[in-house]
Amino acid sequence: MGVAIDPGNVVVALRRQFETNWQMFAVRGVLALALVVVLVIRFYSGIRMLTPSFALYAFADAAALMIAAIWRAPPNGRAWLLVTDALVGFAAGAAVFARPLLPEFSLVIVIGVRVGIGGVLLLMSATRLDGHAGQRVMVAAGMVSVLFTAALFAAPHAGLSWRLAIYLLVFGCLNFALAWQLRSSRR
């Protein structure tokens, strides 16, 4: 016999976790924009620069997610969305780091899976916020991630670095907007 969970308490716990960890979204925005700068500056280095840069980004992003999941975690254990996203990030970073000379198509698959799963998890988190601060921005970030994944898989060989840079620019800005909304809602 399981324990009954009040959906209202789940929403409140998730909202509080995001509000107290608003810095995690700001860090994710900084990381995304830092990779955009690297991709734009080192554009002509191609896949040789993209592979280690993405691996470092995936590890750093996963670390930010894991810290947010553990730090000030809700007592009812509702951090599984953040933990899952972090584990997917660590796996993507490890896959790329272990094989730095991955063929471009393999890198497309790793990036697409990482971004797609992260987008779906953002959408799942957003549906649980039930009209609270940041829900619309979180939905937008999730949709951008899912649409980027679809575009990436639809045309895997079409300008990976530029498409990734554009996606990360939008995703980074949305994370800053989300951090700002969550921080403002704490007052």
Where are these regions (language model features)?
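Small-residue-rich transmembrane alpha-helices that serve as helix-helix interface/gating elements
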Residues: W162-A177
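Membrane-proximal helix-loop-helix units in multi-pass membrane proteins
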Residues: A92-M138
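Hydrophobic alpha-helical transmembrane segments in multi-pass integral membrane proteins
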Residues: A92-L101, V146-S161
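Core segments of transmembrane alpha-helices
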Residues: R28-L35, D85-G93, A141-V146
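Membrane-helix boundary elements
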Residues: I67-A68, R72-A73, L81-E104
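Cytoplasmic-side transmembrane-helix entry/capping segments in multi-pass membrane proteins
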Residues: N76-V88, V110, A133-G142
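N-terminal topogenic module of multi-pass integral membrane proteins
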Residues: M1-P74, R183-R187
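Structural signature of hydrophobic alpha-helical transmembrane segments
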Residues: S45-A60, P100-G116, L164-L168
